[in-house]
Amino acid sequence: MALQLLTPSFSFQHSPSPHKLTTLRYTHHRIRCTASAPSYSDLVRRRSANYKPSKWDSNFVETLESDYKKENHEMYIEKLMGDVKHLMKEVVNPIEKMELVDTIQRLGLGYLFNKEIKEVLNTITTSKATLKTKKDLHAVALQFRLLRQHGYEVSPDAFHEFKDEKGGFKESLCMDIKGMLCLYEASHLSFQGEVVLDEAREFTSTHLKAIGGNIDPVLLKKVRHSLEMPLHWRMLRLEARWYIETYDEEDRKNPSLAELAKHDFNSVQTIYQRSLKRMSRWWRDLGLGERLEFSRDRLVECFFWTTGVIFDPQFERCRGVLTKVNQLVSTIDDVYDVYGSLEELELFTDAVDRWDIRAMEQLPEYMKICYLALYNTTNDIAYEALKEEGLDVIPYLKKVWTDLCKSYIVEARWYSNGYKPTLEEYLENAWTSIAGPVALVHAYFSFGQKMPFEALNYSNTSSLIKWSSMIFRLCDDLATSSDEVARGDVPKSIQCYMYEAGVSESVARDHIKYLIDEAWKKMNECLVYNTPFLQPLINAGLNLARMAHCMYERGDGHGFSNELDKKRVLLLLAEPFKFM
């Protein structure tokens, strides 16, 4: 199946028009989930996913507190900020300017210097000085990556300069390890049809894997890190943590940059800790985890997901909304995948579609609790958007939840009937059932800005949501499909392709990895032709795909987390940098 056959179908064109304030009634129907104990029917045969308890309990969250106090370092941080701004003006050489921008971004400081970075990139695109770098592989690749990453129109044709008369990349390039590494990273920002970048990735990955240990140890460390997963696919806040430590090992490091990066990381970490405590109290008060014992209680994991998608400290409200959404998705997913009978699930889907408090009367007790949690939480989120930005977003939030539940019920019917969908049929439903659209639409209305409704129907927005969710789905399937099918679930993309093409699991997995590569190319196209107000959503879409790689890199990091997942949570949320 060719991935390009799947065209974006995400649209709000048929959504009801936003209501006037005077017609809002949903805030008057808030009902607590603790009204009565659930009554589980013994007549329905229930499945079990055998999920283990979360590695993180409420005690971990409540005792989470950093010794770092930003207010004790305010004057020093201001000085460091000034030093970096001065440095960005002082550096004249175009290559050194690009390297400085790249370093600032990789240290996690890009959000502090957006204006200065934009000025540098604008200068690069208009300056003839960069023409002198066209024979420098490192410079050409770095310029391409930075410009494309920031949405500039840039052609990969410059890389043809590094080919020989036979059309292949020159073997002499293998001596330039720094340039090869930069070209490898740049190749991951390709669009469909950019063959030279496909060739560049194959050429550089082959030769970088073959290098010995006879090179600068810091450069070797970067090569191995990149081959493990390219920068463009990495969870950026964890990458910043890794790069801060690596930058400390460099002989030519800038002390002000190194110090500022550590202070910023610690400062943002304290914001995360405060937010997580607030989310923990929300989840405890909601009572859903205790009432529905069959479902995954994964508040910390959901918050970790959220910080990967929305990591900028100024979007604290958005992180709160997205954490709630992620935990509700996790719970409702377990209702559909694990516990509910098909008849019950049909009723629940209908109730969500109606979005009426009276719809819960038809539900079994355990579903009433789940429905109320969804109804109340979503309406609270909508009320906040109405209060802060004057936007009535309930029709849009209701639509993505309805679409999600309808995609869940399709899979439940497939499972009940023993139906095996084609890969294309599966993916047309599965990019919605992975809940990417739910997450991104809620994020869109929670950035603290008055976001225009019509932007959700832009073709670029539809593509962003579609391909980000597709990467999320395919990464999830690579990591979890065997366990999910074993416990009784619809065939996933791997199994669908095995049945359809008559191939082994190994071949099917390679095909899914190919589809992930192709989906990234479609995602990369969303970086160009965007408008400024869509930039937070574009970043969130990219980061959602990156978090999929992070969480499913070595198994199911959400349902069955391992020691690597635990280490990552601690690095991001619990362990500050120490100062001498």
Curated annotation (Swiss-Prot):
It is found in: Plastid, Chloroplast. Mg(2+) 3 binds at D476, T480, E484. It holds the Pfam family Terpene_synth_C. One of its GO terms (molecular function) is magnesium ion binding. Its cofactor is Mg(2+); Mn(2+). GO terms for cellular component: chloroplast. Transmembrane segments: none annotated. Pathway: Secondary metabolite biosynthesis; terpenoid biosynthesis. It catalyses: (2E)-geranyl diphosphate = alpha-thujene + diphosphate. Mg(2+) 1 binds at D333, D337. The keyword Protein transport does not apply. A motif (DDXXD motif) lies at residues 333-337. Residues 1-32 form a transit peptide. GO terms for biological process: diterpenoid biosynthetic process; green leaf volatile biosynthetic process; monoterpene biosynthetic process. Binds 3 Mg(2+) or Mn(2+) ions per subunit. Keywords: Chloroplast, Lyase, Magnesium, Metal-binding, Plastid, Transit peptide. Mg(2+) 2 binds at D333, D337. Disulfide bonds: none annotated. Expressed in developing and mature fruits. Barely detectable in leaves and shoots. Monomer. Monoterpene synthase (TPS) involved in the biosynthesis of monoterpene natural products used by traditional Chinese medicine to treat headache, inflammation and intoxication. Catalyzes the conversion of (2E)-geranyl diphosphate (GPP) into alpha-thujene. The Asp-Asp-Xaa-Xaa-Asp/Glu (DDXXD/E) motif is important for the catalytic activity, presumably through binding to Mg(2+). Belongs to the terpene synthase family. Tpsb subfamily. This is Alpha-thujene synthase, chloroplastic.
